[in-house]
Amino acid sequence: MIDRLIVAPPEFQIYRDEHGNRLPRPFGLPICLLFTYLCNTSAGYDLFRKPAFNTAMKTLLDSWGLYLTTKDSAKLLTDCEGGWFSEEALQEFESDSRGKFEETYVCPDPDAVNRGFSSWDAFFTREVQPNARPVEAPDDKSVIHNPCESYLHCIARDVKCHDLFWLKGNIYSLYDMLNRDHKLAKQFVGGTIYQGFLSPVDYHRWRSPVDGTIKKTEIVAGTYYAALPDAGAPEGNQYQAAGDLRGALKRSQTWLAMVAARALVYIEADNPDIGLVCFIAVGMVEVSTCEVTVKRGQKVSAGSELGMFHFGGSSFVLVFGPQACITFPEDVVLGKHVKLNSILARVHKA
């Protein structure tokens, strides 16, 4: 079945029950859908963490990623059912005040059905219009800007170098997040973490949250479909009945920051009250590539590109040291879509 999936572009599809209610199945992520129940089992937990499995899966996803750069991969960039410019798809792309597609994103040919994108990858990694997501308060150096169009997943304070991150709950272990680099991890002990989640319809390039200098970049090999098995969806979930076993990957986002394939970008902020910041791009499910586009020693401004995801759902983490007194606006809350380059937080003098 997977052999058939990786020689075709993903379809856009929202799944509904017999009453028309939306089901919690990921759209545009066919392998994730295939593994959705297996992820939430002890056997899946063991299998999907095995290095040999993830090496093989990376090879497969890289092959699919190569196909998604071809002209043939653009054949579902249509307005037909299952197409990424269908009426239902555009409603998703423009939901949560994201804005009209052609006004928000750079389209090579805005009047064409496929908007002029030459491949599915070109469509997925599309650029944002310069005026659609301006950097808010660019001259205020106390501001930390949102590096990815996303939703809040978690804010954690007083983070530890080592912690029991395999337990349920929002527990972070800096040593494991930062690829077991104890020297770097100890610089962030006692600091603050912000983690956000990107929808498949979000903008998937990363921008710098601050003015500063790139100190180090690193690509970390990891898992793609591993999740922490649980008892299913909690009470009060908008799309799932309590106990529905699907969605374990999304519920495991904190844990994935320690184990998933990811990219680390360390930035020394020009503002000493902020200090060293680590941006972590966390690959989830059909993400075969975290591409870093900056190099060590490079100067960046808030809003400068750091890199991008190629295909899939994804997450990101910002890690601040203990010297950074970080506060978040009242409107940064669970469930609210936070726009790229908007004010995510502020740092105050201790």
Swiss-Prot record:
InterPro entries: PS_Dcarbxylase, PsiD-like. The gene is iboD. Pfam families: PS_Dcarbxylase, PSDC. Keywords: Decarboxylase, Lyase. It comes from Amanita muscaria (strain Koide BX008). PANTHER family: PHOSPHATIDYLSERINE DECARBOXYLASE (PTHR10067), PHOSPHATIDYLSERINE DECARBOXYLASE FAMILY PROTEIN (AFU_ORTHOLOGUE AFUA_7G01730) (PTHR10067:SF9). GO terms for molecular function: phosphatidylserine decarboxylase activity. The keyword rRNA processing does not apply. One of its GO terms (biological process) is phosphatidylethanolamine biosynthetic process. It is an enzyme of class 4 (lyase). Pathway: Secondary metabolite biosynthesis. Its EC number is 4.1.1.-. One of its GO terms (cellular component) is mitochondrion. Decarboxylase; part of the gene cluster that mediates the biosynthesis of the psychoactive metabolites ibotenic acid and muscimol. The first committed step is glutamate hydroxylation by the 2-oxoglutarate-dependent dioxygenase iboH, and the last step is decarboxylation of ibotenic acid to muscimol by the decarboxylase iboD. The order of the intermediate reactions is somewhat ambiguous. IboA likely activates the carboxylic acid at position 5 to introduce an amide bond, and the flavin monooxygenase iboF generates the N-O bond. There are several options for the latter step. This is Decarboxylase iboD. Induction: Expression is highly induced during artificial growth in symbiosis with Populus, which is close to its natural condition.
